[in-house]
Amino acid sequence: MNRKTPVKRTRVKQRRLSADDRRNEFVTRATELFAEEGFGGGTRALARKLGVTQPLLYRYFPSKDDLIKEVYRKVYLGPLETGWDKLLSDRSRPLRARLQEFYQAYTDAIFTRKWLRIYLYSGLKGLDINRWYVGMVKDKILTRIIRECRHEAGLAVSKPSAAELELAWVFHGGIFYYGVRKYIYDAPVLEDKAQMISDALDIFLAGFERIAENAADRRRAPVKVAG
């Protein structure tokens, strides 16, 4: 009876990750986890779900907040570092064309299930991510758009009024909610995103024109002299 020759099992040597690669791997896996399950639980539970030990996780991120901040930097700030401020401020091009191109690129960056779920989860959890991001949108995007609208309307450069900011937020928020309806609620939407942006711009620019006209009327109004 012939004896079978034992099969030699070759151990696959795993590539040892560098510190930077390991850190990036943690951030990527944490991003996926936060998008699916939110931000609940402590570092021990987080390490278990990431498939690593808690001490190893601590070597790269001393606290859960540190990991969340890195996820925020990668997911939220990374896509925004694309020179959009220069695009919005380029007065050699028509304002409407700049806004159309900006919101096309902006929504291309944020309209993903992962991005939107993390944003909504962080809002429910009361994390700083939302406050940071809302502040960034106000200071870097909406204030700049209002400044360009004021220039287009021939108004003096000044701090945005409450009415101007609110109009800009309604416009911006409407475009944002299009993404929520499509990628979070799986609700039917107009599939032509460029057309949606163009329609929203019609409403916003008409509204800003009315605000500009009201401001001009107030400047022209005669001053009543008492007595």
For each predicted feature, which ranges?
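Short secondary-structure transition hinges
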Residues: D85, D90-R91, A97, D108-R144, ...
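Short alpha-helical scaffolding segments that buttress acidic/His motifs in well-ordered protein cores
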Residues: Y103-Y106, Y119-G123, F171, I175, ...
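Hydrophobic alpha-helical segments that form the core
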Residues: S158-I184, D192-A206, G227
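Hydrophobic/aromatic residues within well-ordered alpha-helical segments
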Residues: R22, K64, V71, V75-Y76, ...
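N-terminal intrinsically disordered/low-complexity leader segments
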Residues: M1-D21, L87, A212-G227
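Amphipathic alpha-helical linker/stalk segments
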Residues: V71-E101
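Helix-turn-helix
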Residues: E25, R29, L33-E70
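Amphipathic alpha-helical packing segments from all-alpha helical-bundle domains
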Residues: D108, D128-G154, E166-W169, S198, ...
